Amino acid sequence: MDNNLIGARATVYGLFASLYMNGGIERDYEAIIKVLSAISSEPFTDEAKEFSDLMIDRLQNDKNGVLYEFEVLFNLPFGDFINSSASYYHDEREFGEKTISTKEIMHDAGYIKADFYSSGEDEFGMLCAVSSKLLIEQKTILQKKLFDIVLKPTVAGFVDAQLKSERAEFYKSTASLLALFIAFEKSYFEFYG
């Protein structure tokens, strides 16, 4: 397999990890802009360019608004709250089967979640971070397993929740880009197995 393609996939997973983890946008702002700019310059679909351009514009012109939107959508457990646990979209509860599957894959990779990280292992930001790390460390079989068992069956519910949210603006573009990337990943695994 092409190492450049694997590296690009790891980078895009890292982008989504930063966008869906608490503090990720503030911590990784420059890298987020850089990756979105790269996607805009060399999009994997025409729509990817459109969504990455919208995201760059919003981040550069209203970063505080994006941070507020993240808090409202993913951290305030009332109103337009969007659950970011894969188990929620599978078992209709947090810390379910997908949490166990993710813990098993992380164990097989030799990863231990830090105690100071309060979110579950199956939160979409964490799933993207683990996917990125697995690809960087060339643990592609485990990354495919994580994709097949946890991400692929649950991500549509997470994306739909963002697209249907009346309070999401930036995260509608983010969810759309995530959906395009997941479609790319499905095709990638069909081609490379």
Where are these regions (language model features)?
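Surface/interface-facing alpha-helical segments and adjacent flexible terminal/loop regions used
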Residues: 1-193
